[in-house]
């Protein structure tokens, strides 16, 4: 149970972090 809950939680956190990084990188390029 702990391994199954950690797998989806880590995948969702990685996806959210990737989206934030991509948006921050796009804003930085547009501001430059």
Swiss-Prot record:
Main localization (coarse): nucleus
Keywords associated with the record: Chromosome, Developmental protein, Differentiation, DNA condensation, DNA-binding, Nucleosome core, Nucleus, Spermatogenesis
Positions of the UniProt region annotated as Disordered: 1-32
GO BP field: cell differentiation; chromosome condensation; spermatogenesis
Gene Ontology molecular functions: DNA binding
Segments traversing the membrane: none
Keyword Nucleus: yes
Tissue distribution: Testis.
Keyword Cytoplasm included in the entry's annotation: no
Location within or outside the cell: Nucleus; Chromosome
Annotated disulfide bonds: none
Function: Protamines substitute for histones in the chromatin of sperm during the haploid phase of spermatogenesis. They compact sperm DNA into a highly condensed, stable and inactive complex.
Name used for this protein in its record: Protamine
Organism: Oryzias latipes (Japanese rice fish)
